[in-house]
Amino acid sequence: MHDDSLRALAREIRVAVLTGAKRANVGHIGSALSIADIIAALYGRVLRIERPDDPDRDRFILSKGHAALAVYAALRARGWIDEETLSGYCTDATFAGTHPDHHLPGIDFSTGSLGQGLSFGTGAALAARLQGSGRRVFVLVSDAECNEGSVWESVMFAAHHRLSNLVAIVDANGQQALDHTHRVLDLSPLEARWAAFGWRAHLVDGHDLPELCGALSGDDSSAAPRVVLAQTVFGRGVSFMERAIKWHYMPMNDDEYRQALDQVNH
């Protein structure tokens, strides 16, 4: 997918996030908007995925599961789920819940409890090696999620086993549920911390699609896992949501939805 198509996909994801959240009257909007470009890069170019039932396709795990709506939009764009499933977001009508559900095609692990996705991803990467498969495993975590001790246990495990087929992506938007990450637990500089554990760390603009694609595709020749630290803006694309913590949980009213949709489409 060329750059213009990637930008169109990112816009489609943002529209779906806003529409789905408004229809269900739920929050987690800012978190999903911040990863829209990352998801577009993955599903539009980077991931080697043709069929959901291909045992050797790449795996993607959204560890920050509350942003699942962005992934559902990408799965719909690829034709892996239909519009009816996406429209049933956060209802009893489908498995498209607030957090990813492995009953949906393309969802490899049900997440929601933070800190678990990378643990699963390291196991999946090791399993691929033992099976002689060329599949890669990508895991998207949040910077606030790196407060969890289980993340660093996984980081040590992956480096020890030299899992070069594992790529972690950190959505570094600097915010979490109730405050800024540096105020809750300052982990800066994240790049140096991951590198100290033996990972190849790459710091990128999380909204620059060509830069994202280059870093995510990367070079698998080195026998070490990779981490892409994507500097993003919480609520990206909607001016009144950007860096505004209340949009972690806040649903939109009708006027806010119209304004947000207009900004994303223009």
Would you name each region that the model predicts?
Residues 1-5:
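Non-catalytic, mobile gating and regulatory segments of ester bond hydrolases
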Residues 9-26, 171-173:
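N-terminal capping segment at the start of a domain
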Residues 20, 33-160:
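Cofactor-binding active-site loop characterized by glycine-rich and histidine/acidic residues
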Residues 25-33:
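Structural motif
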Residues 58-60, 135-139, 166, 222-232:
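Generic beta-sheet signal
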Residues 66-67, 71, 173-174, 208, ...:
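Glycine-rich beta-alpha junction loops
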Residues 106, 110-113, 117-220:
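Thiamine diphosphate
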Residues 209, 214-266:
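Glycine/aspartate-rich loop-and-adjacent alpha/beta segment that forms the canonical ThDP
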